[in-house]
Amino acid sequence: MKIITRGEAMRIHRQHPASRLFPFCTGKYRWHGGTEAYTGREVQDIPGVLAVFAERHKDSFGPYVRLMSVTLN
């Protein structure tokens, strides 16, 4: 499965009313550039996960990426 843009993920989320947004993993990855730096990268294929997208967050250590998923579970 590949990381897609947030817009594409929200489109999938709206198409499946039973889906919800959930963190894909608990890791934090240092922010590099923009979301396009992460779009297209391969991630583990997990049953029930419809899409994965990158989201920018910030804490006291600086900006980081959090991978979010659209899931049916």
Where are each of the predicted segments found?
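Acidic, low-complexity, intrinsically disordered interaction modules
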Residues: 15-73
